[in-house]
Amino acid sequence: MGASCTATQSQFLLYTLTSSEETVGSVGDSCRGPEEEAEKPVKTKTVSSSNGGESSSRSAEKRSAEDEAADLPTKPTKMSKFGFAIGSQTARKASAISIRLGASKPKETVPTLAPKTLSVAAAFNEDEDSEPEEMPPEAKMRMKNIGRDTPTSAGPNSFNKGKHGFSDNQKLWERNIKSHLGNVHDQDN
């Protein structure tokens, strides 16, 4: 329990020392070797003890660490970052590639549309008394769409379509029988 508490305190102190240079908890902090951790100066703060206000003697290690920290310049040394930082990488890549839109291209003049509009208006002018075009016979046959030989006779909605268009074969048979009976009855009289 004591070791984890000191580790947390050392991480906090490390964070306070290097807050302007790098963040705690990045992948780079956990990947450093023991040599790099030993080179960092550790500042210690005096914390009030729970021994009732009595003065406590500091160990030689703490005094030497404070002396070393005092000897070093106050400006923290810049460490090379080793890790994955999304924000800093995108900023660097953006500065490497610069795209300027419209700066290199000369402005083109837009041609006037007045001559084209006049020719289009002349093509669709209905004021002229010209004779309408005649349809070719093939187009007329397709528009009528009557009979078995039309292109839609084999379509999905062409069930019961015969030579005479859509018809019911049973009714056609009954009509033919009635007409034959009528012809036979007329012949007998």
UniProtKB/Swiss-Prot annotation:
Q: What is its main location?
A: nucleus
Region: Disordered; residue ranges are 21-84, 145-169
Keyword vocabulary terms for this entry:
Acetylation, Cell cycle, Nucleus, Phosphoprotein, Ubl conjugation
> Composition bias, kind Basic and acidic residues: at what positions?
32-42
Give a short account of its post-translational modification. Answer: Ubiquitinated; mediated by UHRF2 and leading to its subsequent proteasomal degradation.
The residue ranges flagged as biased composition, category Low complexity, are: 48-58
Location of Phosphoserine modifications: S64, S88, S98, S130, S158
Which residues in this protein are found as N6-acetyllysine?
K75, K161, K163
Any one of the GO BP annotations: proteasome-mediated ubiquitin-dependent protein catabolic process
| Key word Lipoprotein present | no
Positions where Phosphothreonine occurs in the chain: T150
* Segments of skewed composition (Polar residues): 150-160
- Write out the GO cellular component annotations: nucleus
Q: InterPro entries from the entry?
A: PCNP
Q: Where in the cell is it found?
A: Nucleus
Cross-referenced PANTHER family, in alphabetical order? PEST PROTEOLYTIC SIGNAL-CONTAINING NUCLEAR PROTEIN
Q: State the oligomer form and interacting partners.
A: Interacts with UHRF2/NIRF.
Function of the protein: May be involved in cell cycle regulation.
Tell me the protein's name.
PEST proteolytic signal-containing nuclear protein
